[in-house]
From Swiss-Prot:
Pfam families: RNA_pol_Rpb1_1, RNA_pol_Rpb1_2, RNA_pol_Rpb1_3. The keyword Manganese does not apply. It comes from Pinus koraiensis (Korean pine). GO terms for biological process: DNA-templated transcription. It catalyses: RNA(n) + a ribonucleoside 5'-triphosphate = RNA(n+1) + diphosphate. Binds 1 Mg(2+) ion per subunit. This is DNA-directed RNA polymerase subunit beta'. SUPFAM superfamilies: beta and beta-prime subunits of DNA dependent RNA-polymerase (SSF64484). It is an enzyme of class 2 (transferase). Zn(2+) binds at residues 69, 71, 87, 90.
Amino acid sequence: MIEQNKHQQLRIGLASPEQICAWSEKILPNGEIVGQVTKPYTLHYETNKPERDGSFCERIFGPIKSRVCACGNSPGIGNEKIDSKFCTQCGVEFVDSRIRRYQMGYIKLACPVVHVWYLKRLPSYIANLLAKTRKELEGPVYCDLFLARPIAKKPTLLRSRGTFNYEIQSWKDIIPHYLSARPHYLFARGSGTFKEREIATGGDAIGEQLTGLDLQMIIDRSHMEWKNLVELKWNRLEENQESTVDRWEDEKIRRRKDFLVGRIKLAKHFLRTNIEPKWMVLCLLPVLPPEPRPIVQLGEGGLITSSDLNELYRRVINRNNTLTNLLARSGSESFVICQKKLIQEAVDALLDNGICGQPMRDSHDRPYKSFSDVIEGKEGRFRENLLGKRVDYSGRSVIVVGPFLSLYQCGLPSEIAIELFQAFVIRSLIGRHIAPNLRAAKSMIRDKGPIVWEVLQEVMQGHPVLLNRAPTLHKLGIQAFQPILVEGRAIRLHPSVCGGFNADFDGDQMAVHVPLSLEARAEARLLMFSETNLLSPAIGDPISIPTQDMLLGLYISTVENSQGIYGNRYHPYHSEKKSFSCKKPSFYSYDDVLRAYRQKRIDLYSPLWLRWGELDLRIITSVNQEAPIEVQYESLGTFHEIHEHYRIRKGRMGEILNIYIRTTVGRTRFNREMEEAIQGFACFEHPKKSLPALRI
């Protein structure tokens, strides 16, 4: 059983036969070792009790009822009780029935079996280590081809290495006739010695090749070959050969380099984790505890349903027992080879049904659900039962756009915020002596008085929250934000951060989590804030960019009459085409423009003259000064030069008195926002310098 206080991580990997025995075997108080499943039976058809040494045996996996043995006795009942921990009649220990959730068993295979995950899956680790293709390995694995292995300094029949077709009928007559003329072969069972010493097939053939691997030598040789390929590639580049043949050769070199890199990584992983490659060939097959593969009766006397894993285990045990009997009786070689192939197929179906072609099916033509089907997918053990569980201090709601938010802020509904931060609010209320005890603080929170919202806002100021949108495919799928209380029930989000979440505002939901510890809050503040994650982790391009809605809004707010100063006396964007004075209003500052807009004296697209604070025209005109369109003289001798985009007022001597630029309310507002943003960034970068006002 996994105890929370002792285990802090879970690693999935290959297990050695010794480790499988340690998981499965246990020593009873009488010294008997149990753990091996030898019978294909599950429950007795009359008593519905587990069969002895079967896949539900109580001696192996523990009692069905806590502290009650298979005989029905308990430690306090019965005169034949010798030990309070053990029943001498049935051999069942008096322990808690929860042991059946984690106590495993094992099947001792009569022949080694290759683990199909490491053979058929991509990439094929066995094929990678042995530097062969999967098709070359499938022949020996499924007993279609045989591996010749001449032994040095010993009498041998075969002089070849590698795989070959072993025809049973042709060799059955040749080998005994050959051995009868050579009495030094007759110390054993004739052709049996030849087959055991010089021919291998099935899991034996693959296991022997994996056992003889030197991982460090594989790394060194692969690295040397990779360097040679790199030098060959550079030589081709220097020769500037671009023919079709050379392109094919370059592609072959690239594929070979990728293969070598993968092989080096795999060998280094085996060395780093102290895993032996031969463990990819199974000699002992673990049997899952009974709880993950239950047998359930539907009602009293009703139909009994069983997990598909039980049927797949039954097939493995039946075929394994058949092969054991054949080997014990020295059965026909063709039968033995055929049975080895059947065991390999049965184990393949148990681990991953259908990976080798047509899956095994039940009487209703439904494919059996294998171990891979149980653990993979959205409804598998990991995602359904282990991941995605409900956690404390978390919530979930629909996201909507928050145009008033900064990039690092998110709008948190008050209903969600008061639940997430309730513990912090209670502590603050009691610490400030606003509430005398816990009950009074909870009562104040239920009443939702004004003081509660004030305390909540103070608590949220220094406490970031994490927003997560499933599926979390990269690190930007979960980011930290500073929460802001908002009305309603939807989480408000800045539109520019949607790129990292791959989210939009068409009904997407997000989960919100509250980091509790000081370390988690510091990590969220320093590493996970949205304003510090502006670049894509995959390609490095900006990922927090203006959305299409923002760009369209900016375009609409800053659009002006295409005719400019030459427009007619009717405003082109006015809905009723009302006439207005040709004399455009003049304003001294941004505030005057926005004040007039709020008072509805002008609209968003009204052309106006705004006084320009700088007398340097280089930032609004070209190098060559354009001629004025119109010159207006005043009675005191001053005059106005009207240009297309600006107006200059000059004195009698030609000196510049002031400058007005032609713009609109929308452009004025946009320019002010940009100026404040740049000014704030400049002050943040150079806090000790007084920067002049920026004009855009």
